[in-house]
Swiss-Prot record:
Keyword line: Ribonucleoprotein, Ribosomal protein
One Pfam family of this chain: Ribosomal_L36
GO molecular function: structural constituent of ribosome
Transmembrane feature ranges: none
UniProt GO cellular component terms: cytoplasm; ribonucleoprotein complex; ribosome
Matches recorded under PROSITE patterns: RIBOSOMAL_L36
GO biological process, one term: translation
Similarity section: Belongs to the bacterial ribosomal protein bL36 family.
Protein name from the UniProt record: Large ribosomal subunit protein bL36
Organism: Cupriavidus necator (strain ATCC 17699 / DSM 428 / KCTC 22496 / NCIMB 10442 / H16 / Stanier 337) (Ralstonia eutropha)
Lineage: Bacteria, Pseudomonadati, Pseudomonadota, Betaproteobacteria, Burkholderiales
Amino acid sequence: MKVLASVKRICRNCKIIKRNGVVRVICSSDPRHKQRQG
């Protein structure tokens, strides 16, 4: 998981969600696209 200041969708399967006040990107097609804002 990448921890970035600015999270962006990498592909069309990426979803931006907010979990416990933390913005995250989850991806069903490529787990390497996972990101967290921090």
